[in-house]
């Protein structure tokens, strides 16, 4: 009831309400009108005869109101697209969404290069048409409510975190990230860094030049501060992703600079060992 109430408050607030006969459907015996708020179509209103009054004039009563005006035209602002991890439970305004609304699958974009090693994580894509109010979307996965946000073309629910796995892997994640930074300033080796990698990550790393030209010929020291691992997502028992951020501080005799390192990692488990399968620089 609150959803409907809020919808009408938003729809008619500070608007001029008007109506017109609906061409092609209006007749003297079956009046049909289009209701407007300013220039926006809100509803089709159909009247039916209630009775004849003492003067033989017809008194009318409401027969029906159709609020799906927009969904019958090219306006689709009340359609809802939801992307959620496969086998999730999706609810809209507290009502469970049937699997009948699943229109397809989509690979998780971060994990598009892991298929040679593990099963590629996928999302279910839901499309629900004919909504006349902004929905409240909730997604649960294995009993855990997921982070869900509105993106450019609909709602997206993200795979859950796993505190236990993050705790056991955090040191490993930071070791890989620190070795990346050391390699970039020529204080680490490509062979050491590559030993943590497979697949696309290993190929990508081999194409990145080692040292910033700004440091060539300089004698310098360095340290790493403000390390942080965030957006940890577990897709399965053998695949996860995360963001890694830290500052790589470099000092030399006459100055200093700080490199703000921001990476997104995708790890897969191979032979009981977590390997970096893909990464991107943010």
Regions flagged by a language model, labelled:
Residues 62, 219-225, 276:
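A broad structural signal for short, well-ordered beta-strand segments within beta-sheet-rich domains
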């Amino acid at each position: 009831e609150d959803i409907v109430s809020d919808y009408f408050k938003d729809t008619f607030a500070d608007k001029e309400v008007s109506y017109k006969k609906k061409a092609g459907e209006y007749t003297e015996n079956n009046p049909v009108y289009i209701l407007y708020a300013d220039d926006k179509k809100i509803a089709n209103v159909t009247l039916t005869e209630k009775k004849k009054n003492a003067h033989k004039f017809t008194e009318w009563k409401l027969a029906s109101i159709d609020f799906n005006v927009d969904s019958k035209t090219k306006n689709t602002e009340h359609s809802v697209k939801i992307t959620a991890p496969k086998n999730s439970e999706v609810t809209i305004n507290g009502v469970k969404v049937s699997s009948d609304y699943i229109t397809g699958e989509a690979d998780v974009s971060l994990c598009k290069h892991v298929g040679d090693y593990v099963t590629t994580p996928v999302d279910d894509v839901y499309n629900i048409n004919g909504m006349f109010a902004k929905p409240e979307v909730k997604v649960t996965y294995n009993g855990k409510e997921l982070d869900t946000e509105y993106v450019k073309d609909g709602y997206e629910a993200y795979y859950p975190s796993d505190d236990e796995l993050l705790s056991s892997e955090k040191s490993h994640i930071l070791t890989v990230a620190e070795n990346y930074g050391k390699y970039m300033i020529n204080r680490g080796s490509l062979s050491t860094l590559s030993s943590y990698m497979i697949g696309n990550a290993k190929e990508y790393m081999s194409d990145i030049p080692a040292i910033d030209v700004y440091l060539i010929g300089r004698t310098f020291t360095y340290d790493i501060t403000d390390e942080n691992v965030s957006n940890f997502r577990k897709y399965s028992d053998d695949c996860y992703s995360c963001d890694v951020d830290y500052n790589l501080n470099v000092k030399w005799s006459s100055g200093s600079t700080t490199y703000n390192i921001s990476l997104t990692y995708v790890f897969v488990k191979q032979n009981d060992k977590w390997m970096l399968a893909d990464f991107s620089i943010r």
